[in-house]
Amino acid sequence: MMMLAVAAVLAWPAAAQPAVAEADFIVRDFGFGDGRRLPELKQHYRTLGTPQRDAQGNITNAVMIGHGTGGTGAQFLVPQFTRLFAPGAPLDLATHFIILPDAIGHGGSSKPSDGLRMAFPAYDYADMVRAQGLLLDHLKVKRLRLLMGTSMGCMMGFQFGTDLPGRAAAIMPLACNVIPLAGRNRLWRAMAINAIKADPDWNGGNYTTPPLNGLRVGVALQVMASSAPVRMQADWPTRDAADAAAQRAMAQGLAGSADANDRIYQLEASRNYHPAPHLARITVPVTWVNSADDVINPPGVGDAALQVKAMPQGRFVLIPESAETRGHSTHTWSQFWEGELKALLARSN
Protein backbone atom coordinates (compact mmCIF):
# COMPACT_ATOMS: atom_id res chain seq x y z
CA MET A 1 0.00 0.00 0.00
CA MET A 2 0.97 3.64 0.26
CA MET A 3 4.59 3.96 1.30
CA LEU A 4 6.59 7.02 2.22
CA ALA A 5 9.36 8.00 -0.15
CA VAL A 6 12.65 6.60 1.09
CA ALA A 7 16.28 7.21 0.41
CA ALA A 8 18.30 4.49 -1.26
CA VAL A 9 19.67 3.06 1.97
CA LEU A 10 20.89 -0.38 1.04
CA ALA A 11 22.14 -3.30 3.08
CA TRP A 12 25.80 -2.74 2.33
CA PRO A 13 28.51 -0.55 3.86
CA ALA A 14 28.18 3.00 2.54
CA ALA A 15 31.33 2.72 0.43
CA ALA A 16 30.01 -0.39 -1.31
CA GLN A 17 26.43 0.64 -2.02
CA PRO A 18 25.33 -0.50 -5.48
CA ALA A 19 24.38 2.11 -8.02
CA VAL A 20 20.71 2.83 -8.64
CA ALA A 21 20.10 4.23 -12.13
CA GLU A 22 16.92 6.18 -12.89
CA ALA A 23 15.42 6.92 -16.30
CA ASP A 24 12.20 7.73 -18.13
CA PHE A 25 10.63 5.90 -21.06
CA ILE A 26 8.12 7.75 -23.24
CA VAL A 27 5.33 5.86 -25.01
CA ARG A 28 3.79 7.83 -27.89
CA ASP A 29 0.01 7.91 -28.33
CA PHE A 30 -0.82 5.48 -25.53
CA GLY A 31 -4.42 4.27 -25.53
CA PHE A 32 -6.24 3.52 -22.27
CA GLY A 33 -9.03 1.06 -21.66
CA ASP A 34 -11.50 3.92 -21.15
CA GLY A 35 -10.96 5.00 -24.77
CA ARG A 36 -8.83 8.02 -23.91
CA ARG A 37 -5.33 8.54 -25.29
CA LEU A 38 -2.25 10.43 -24.13
CA PRO A 39 0.13 11.83 -26.76
CA GLU A 40 2.97 10.93 -24.41
CA LEU A 41 2.94 8.51 -21.48
CA LYS A 42 6.00 8.75 -19.26
CA GLN A 43 7.16 5.74 -17.30
CA HIS A 44 9.82 6.34 -14.69
CA TYR A 45 11.92 3.41 -13.55
CA ARG A 46 14.99 2.44 -11.55
CA THR A 47 17.48 -0.30 -12.31
CA LEU A 48 20.13 -2.07 -10.27
CA GLY A 49 22.48 -4.92 -10.99
CA THR A 50 24.12 -6.54 -13.97
CA PRO A 51 22.23 -7.29 -17.20
CA GLN A 52 23.16 -10.48 -19.03
CA ARG A 53 22.34 -10.65 -22.74
CA ASP A 54 21.82 -13.37 -25.30
CA ALA A 55 23.23 -13.33 -28.83
CA GLN A 56 20.41 -11.04 -29.98
CA GLY A 57 21.07 -8.51 -27.22
CA ASN A 58 18.03 -9.40 -25.12
CA ILE A 59 18.39 -9.24 -21.34
CA THR A 60 17.91 -12.71 -19.87
CA ASN A 61 18.27 -12.15 -16.10
CA ALA A 62 15.77 -9.35 -15.43
CA VAL A 63 13.65 -9.24 -12.28
CA MET A 64 10.80 -6.71 -12.17
CA ILE A 65 9.28 -5.76 -8.81
CA GLY A 66 5.95 -3.92 -8.60
CA HIS A 67 5.12 -1.50 -5.77
CA GLY A 68 1.95 -0.87 -3.79
CA THR A 69 -0.86 1.67 -4.11
CA GLY A 70 0.57 5.15 -3.72
CA GLY A 71 4.15 3.88 -3.68
CA THR A 72 7.08 3.96 -6.09
CA GLY A 73 9.92 1.64 -6.99
CA ALA A 74 11.98 3.40 -4.32
CA GLN A 75 9.93 1.71 -1.59
CA PHE A 76 12.07 -1.41 -2.03
CA LEU A 77 15.32 0.42 -1.34
CA VAL A 78 15.17 -0.36 2.36
CA PRO A 79 17.36 -2.82 4.29
CA GLN A 80 14.60 -5.36 4.98
CA PHE A 81 14.21 -5.82 1.22
CA THR A 82 17.62 -4.98 -0.26
CA ARG A 83 19.18 -7.79 1.76
CA LEU A 84 17.93 -9.91 -1.16
CA PHE A 85 20.36 -8.06 -3.45
CA ALA A 86 23.49 -8.69 -1.37
CA PRO A 87 26.33 -10.96 -2.54
CA GLY A 88 25.19 -14.57 -2.36
CA ALA A 89 21.56 -13.62 -1.70
CA PRO A 90 18.72 -14.87 -3.95
CA LEU A 91 18.73 -11.73 -6.13
CA ASP A 92 22.47 -11.04 -5.98
CA LEU A 93 23.10 -7.96 -8.12
CA ALA A 94 26.12 -9.62 -9.69
CA THR A 95 23.82 -12.11 -11.40
CA HIS A 96 20.47 -10.28 -11.61
CA PHE A 97 19.19 -7.11 -13.27
CA ILE A 98 16.51 -5.49 -11.12
CA ILE A 99 13.81 -3.24 -12.62
CA LEU A 100 11.76 -1.07 -10.24
CA PRO A 101 9.10 0.77 -12.27
CA ASP A 102 6.80 3.54 -11.07
CA ALA A 103 3.36 2.45 -12.28
CA ILE A 104 1.09 4.83 -14.19
CA GLY A 105 -0.30 7.40 -11.77
CA HIS A 106 2.60 7.04 -9.34
CA GLY A 107 5.96 8.62 -8.60
CA GLY A 108 7.77 9.97 -11.63
CA SER A 109 5.38 8.42 -14.16
CA SER A 110 2.49 10.22 -15.85
CA LYS A 111 -0.28 11.09 -13.39
CA PRO A 112 -3.22 13.49 -12.92
CA SER A 113 -1.17 16.05 -10.99
CA ASP A 114 1.01 16.62 -14.06
CA GLY A 115 -1.72 19.00 -15.24
CA LEU A 116 -4.84 17.19 -16.43
CA ARG A 117 -6.13 16.68 -12.90
CA MET A 118 -9.51 14.88 -13.01
CA ALA A 119 -9.45 14.92 -16.82
CA PHE A 120 -6.61 12.38 -16.78
CA PRO A 121 -7.55 9.03 -18.39
CA ALA A 122 -9.20 6.62 -15.94
CA TYR A 123 -6.40 4.05 -15.93
CA ASP A 124 -6.76 0.58 -14.46
CA TYR A 125 -4.44 -2.32 -13.69
CA ALA A 126 -4.71 -3.61 -17.26
CA ASP A 127 -3.44 -0.26 -18.58
CA MET A 128 -0.62 -0.25 -16.04
CA VAL A 129 0.47 -3.78 -16.96
CA ARG A 130 0.31 -3.11 -20.70
CA ALA A 131 2.51 -0.04 -20.21
CA GLN A 132 5.02 -2.10 -18.24
CA GLY A 133 5.09 -4.63 -21.07
CA LEU A 134 6.10 -1.79 -23.40
CA LEU A 135 8.78 -0.75 -20.91
CA LEU A 136 10.18 -4.29 -21.02
CA ASP A 137 10.19 -4.14 -24.82
CA HIS A 138 12.15 -0.88 -24.60
CA LEU A 139 14.68 -2.49 -22.24
CA LYS A 140 14.97 -5.55 -24.53
CA VAL A 141 13.51 -7.95 -21.98
CA LYS A 142 11.51 -10.55 -23.87
CA ARG A 143 10.99 -12.69 -20.78
CA LEU A 144 11.54 -11.83 -17.14
CA ARG A 145 13.49 -14.28 -15.03
CA LEU A 146 11.13 -13.32 -12.20
CA LEU A 147 8.17 -11.02 -11.64
CA MET A 148 7.53 -9.96 -8.05
CA GLY A 149 5.02 -7.51 -6.61
CA THR A 150 3.63 -6.38 -3.28
CA SER A 151 0.02 -5.34 -2.55
CA MET A 152 -1.06 -3.48 -5.72
CA GLY A 153 2.09 -4.93 -7.30
CA CYS A 154 0.86 -8.36 -6.22
CA MET A 155 -2.44 -7.78 -8.01
CA MET A 156 -0.61 -6.42 -11.03
CA GLY A 157 1.48 -9.60 -10.98
CA PHE A 158 -1.65 -11.69 -11.48
CA GLN A 159 -2.91 -9.20 -14.09
CA PHE A 160 0.47 -9.44 -15.88
CA GLY A 161 0.42 -13.23 -15.75
CA THR A 162 -3.05 -13.46 -17.29
CA ASP A 163 -2.71 -10.59 -19.80
CA LEU A 164 0.89 -11.30 -20.88
CA PRO A 165 1.26 -15.05 -20.34
CA GLY A 166 4.76 -16.39 -20.74
CA ARG A 167 6.54 -13.05 -20.35
CA ALA A 168 7.83 -14.08 -16.92
CA ALA A 169 9.54 -17.38 -16.13
CA ALA A 170 8.30 -17.23 -12.53
CA ILE A 171 5.91 -15.04 -10.54
CA MET A 172 5.92 -14.22 -6.81
CA PRO A 173 2.87 -12.17 -5.77
CA LEU A 174 2.94 -10.96 -2.15
CA ALA A 175 -0.09 -9.74 -0.17
CA CYS A 176 -3.21 -9.78 -2.33
CA ASN A 177 -6.15 -11.83 -3.55
CA VAL A 178 -7.49 -12.59 -7.02
CA ILE A 179 -11.14 -11.71 -6.44
CA PRO A 180 -12.76 -8.33 -7.15
CA LEU A 181 -12.11 -5.66 -4.54
CA ALA A 182 -15.32 -5.54 -2.52
CA GLY A 183 -16.24 -5.86 1.15
CA ARG A 184 -13.88 -4.13 3.56
CA ASN A 185 -11.10 -3.78 0.99
CA ARG A 186 -13.33 -1.62 -1.21
CA LEU A 187 -15.06 0.00 1.77
CA TRP A 188 -11.98 1.74 3.12
CA ARG A 189 -10.94 2.83 -0.39
CA ALA A 190 -14.39 4.26 -1.12
CA MET A 191 -14.40 6.08 2.22
CA ALA A 192 -10.97 7.58 1.51
CA ILE A 193 -12.11 8.76 -1.93
CA ASN A 194 -15.39 10.15 -0.58
CA ALA A 195 -13.57 12.01 2.20
CA ILE A 196 -11.39 13.83 -0.33
CA LYS A 197 -14.34 14.70 -2.55
CA ALA A 198 -16.40 15.90 0.44
CA ASP A 199 -13.69 18.36 1.51
CA PRO A 200 -14.73 21.80 0.17
CA ASP A 201 -11.08 22.53 -0.64
CA TRP A 202 -11.09 19.73 -3.22
CA ASN A 203 -13.35 21.84 -5.48
CA GLY A 204 -14.01 19.12 -8.05
CA GLY A 205 -10.28 18.49 -8.32
CA ASN A 206 -9.45 22.10 -9.20
CA TYR A 207 -8.01 23.00 -5.82
CA THR A 208 -5.41 25.59 -4.98
CA THR A 209 -5.12 24.47 -1.35
CA PRO A 210 -4.75 20.72 -0.72
CA PRO A 211 -7.88 19.18 0.84
CA LEU A 212 -6.09 18.22 4.05
CA ASN A 213 -9.19 17.25 6.00
CA GLY A 214 -10.09 14.71 3.36
CA LEU A 215 -6.54 13.45 3.16
CA ARG A 216 -6.41 13.03 6.95
CA VAL A 217 -9.33 10.61 6.79
CA GLY A 218 -7.51 8.65 4.11
CA VAL A 219 -4.33 8.47 6.17
CA ALA A 220 -6.25 7.19 9.19
CA LEU A 221 -7.99 4.53 7.11
CA GLN A 222 -4.67 3.53 5.55
CA VAL A 223 -2.98 3.15 8.92
CA MET A 224 -5.76 0.90 10.19
CA ALA A 225 -5.91 -1.12 6.97
CA SER A 226 -2.16 -1.77 7.15
CA SER A 227 -2.14 -2.48 10.89
CA ALA A 228 -0.64 -5.53 12.60
CA PRO A 229 -2.46 -5.96 15.95
CA VAL A 230 -0.01 -8.30 17.71
CA ARG A 231 3.05 -6.37 16.58
CA MET A 232 1.49 -3.01 17.48
CA GLN A 233 0.49 -4.22 20.95
CA ALA A 234 4.11 -5.21 21.54
CA ASP A 235 5.44 -1.91 20.18
CA TRP A 236 2.95 0.37 21.97
CA PRO A 237 1.86 -1.42 25.16
CA THR A 238 0.51 1.69 26.91
CA ARG A 239 -2.12 4.29 26.10
CA ASP A 240 0.51 7.04 25.95
CA ALA A 241 2.70 5.04 23.58
CA ALA A 242 -0.24 4.36 21.27
CA ASP A 243 -1.31 8.03 21.35
CA ALA A 244 2.21 9.13 20.43
CA ALA A 245 2.28 6.57 17.62
CA ALA A 246 -1.02 7.92 16.30
CA GLN A 247 0.42 11.43 16.14
CA ARG A 248 3.53 10.20 14.33
CA ALA A 249 1.53 8.09 11.89
CA MET A 250 -0.71 11.01 10.93
CA ALA A 251 2.22 13.41 10.48
CA GLN A 252 4.21 10.91 8.44
CA GLY A 253 1.16 9.90 6.43
CA LEU A 254 0.32 13.48 5.47
CA ALA A 255 3.95 14.21 4.63
CA GLY A 256 4.00 11.21 2.30
CA SER A 257 0.49 11.58 0.88
CA ALA A 258 0.02 11.74 -2.84
CA ASP A 259 -1.67 14.69 -4.49
CA ALA A 260 -5.39 14.34 -3.73
CA ASN A 261 -6.41 13.73 -7.35
CA ASP A 262 -3.57 11.26 -7.79
CA ARG A 263 -4.79 9.45 -4.70
CA ILE A 264 -8.34 9.16 -6.03
CA TYR A 265 -7.06 7.66 -9.28
CA GLN A 266 -4.72 5.27 -7.45
CA LEU A 267 -7.55 3.93 -5.32
CA GLU A 268 -9.94 3.63 -8.27
CA ALA A 269 -7.48 1.74 -10.49
CA SER A 270 -8.55 -1.56 -8.91
CA ARG A 271 -12.22 -1.08 -9.85
CA ASN A 272 -12.37 -3.90 -12.45
CA TYR A 273 -9.62 -6.17 -11.11
CA HIS A 274 -10.65 -9.84 -11.29
CA PRO A 275 -8.02 -12.28 -12.58
CA ALA A 276 -9.51 -15.37 -10.91
CA PRO A 277 -11.40 -16.67 -14.00
CA HIS A 278 -8.20 -16.48 -16.07
CA LEU A 279 -5.61 -17.97 -13.71
CA ALA A 280 -5.21 -21.10 -15.86
CA ARG A 281 -3.37 -18.92 -18.37
CA ILE A 282 -0.51 -18.72 -15.85
CA THR A 283 1.41 -21.93 -16.50
CA VAL A 284 4.81 -20.88 -15.11
CA PRO A 285 5.84 -21.56 -11.49
CA VAL A 286 4.07 -19.23 -9.03
CA THR A 287 4.59 -18.79 -5.29
CA TRP A 288 1.81 -16.64 -3.82
CA VAL A 289 2.48 -15.39 -0.29
CA ASN A 290 -0.01 -13.82 2.12
CA SER A 291 0.27 -13.29 5.87
CA ALA A 292 -2.27 -14.28 8.51
CA ASP A 293 -2.24 -10.83 10.15
CA ASP A 294 -2.95 -8.94 6.92
CA VAL A 295 -6.11 -6.92 7.64
CA ILE A 296 -6.53 -6.11 3.94
CA ASN A 297 -6.28 -9.73 2.77
CA PRO A 298 -7.23 -11.84 5.81
CA PRO A 299 -7.21 -15.65 5.55
CA GLY A 300 -11.01 -15.84 5.57
CA VAL A 301 -11.39 -13.75 2.40
CA GLY A 302 -10.59 -14.78 -1.16
CA ASP A 303 -9.98 -18.51 -0.63
CA ALA A 304 -6.41 -18.26 -1.91
CA ALA A 305 -5.63 -21.90 -1.06
CA LEU A 306 -8.36 -22.97 -3.49
CA GLN A 307 -7.74 -20.30 -6.14
CA VAL A 308 -4.06 -21.23 -6.46
CA LYS A 309 -5.04 -24.68 -7.76
CA ALA A 310 -6.16 -23.08 -11.04
CA MET A 311 -2.49 -22.47 -11.85
CA PRO A 312 -0.72 -25.71 -12.85
CA GLN A 313 2.48 -24.79 -10.99
CA GLY A 314 0.97 -22.56 -8.31
CA ARG A 315 1.88 -22.70 -4.62
CA PHE A 316 0.18 -20.71 -1.84
CA VAL A 317 1.93 -19.86 1.43
CA LEU A 318 0.30 -18.25 4.48
CA ILE A 319 2.79 -16.74 6.94
CA PRO A 320 1.56 -17.23 10.53
CA GLU A 321 0.93 -14.18 12.70
CA SER A 322 3.52 -13.38 15.35
CA ALA A 323 4.91 -10.42 17.26
CA GLU A 324 7.49 -10.13 14.48
CA THR A 325 5.24 -10.08 11.41
CA ARG A 326 4.11 -6.70 10.09
CA GLY A 327 0.54 -7.20 8.95
CA HIS A 328 0.04 -6.21 5.33
CA SER A 329 3.59 -4.84 5.26
CA THR A 330 5.05 -8.29 5.86
CA HIS A 331 5.33 -8.32 2.07
CA THR A 332 8.47 -6.14 2.26
CA TRP A 333 10.16 -7.91 5.21
CA SER A 334 11.98 -10.54 3.19
CA GLN A 335 13.19 -12.64 6.12
CA PHE A 336 9.68 -14.10 6.37
CA TRP A 337 9.59 -15.46 2.81
CA GLU A 338 13.17 -15.53 1.51
CA GLY A 339 13.20 -19.33 1.64
CA GLU A 340 10.13 -19.46 -0.60
CA LEU A 341 11.86 -17.12 -3.06
CA LYS A 342 14.89 -19.40 -3.21
CA ALA A 343 12.67 -22.42 -3.82
CA LEU A 344 10.73 -20.63 -6.56
CA LEU A 345 13.92 -19.67 -8.36
CA ALA A 346 15.15 -23.25 -8.09
CA ARG A 347 11.97 -24.79 -9.52
CA SER A 348 11.75 -22.29 -12.37
CA ASN A 349 15.38 -22.52 -13.45
Model features per residue range: what roles?
Residues 46-114, 303:
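N-terminal cap/lid subdomain of alpha/beta-hydrolase-fold enzymes
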Residues 89-138, 180, 184-202, 323-325:
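Cap/lid segment of the alpha/beta-hydrolase catalytic domain
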Residues 143-182:
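Conserved hydrolase catalytic core segment
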Residues 167-252:
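Alpha/beta-hydrolase-fold enzymes
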Residues 262-278:
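Active-site nucleophile elbow and catalytic-triad environment of alpha/beta-hydrolase enzymes
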Residues 282, 288-290:
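Short beta-strand/loop motif that positions the catalytic acidic residue
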Residues 295-302:
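Conserved alpha/beta-hydrolase "acid-adjacent" motif
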Residues 313-349:
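Catalytic active-site module of serine/aspartate enzymes centered on a nucleophile-bearing elbow/loop
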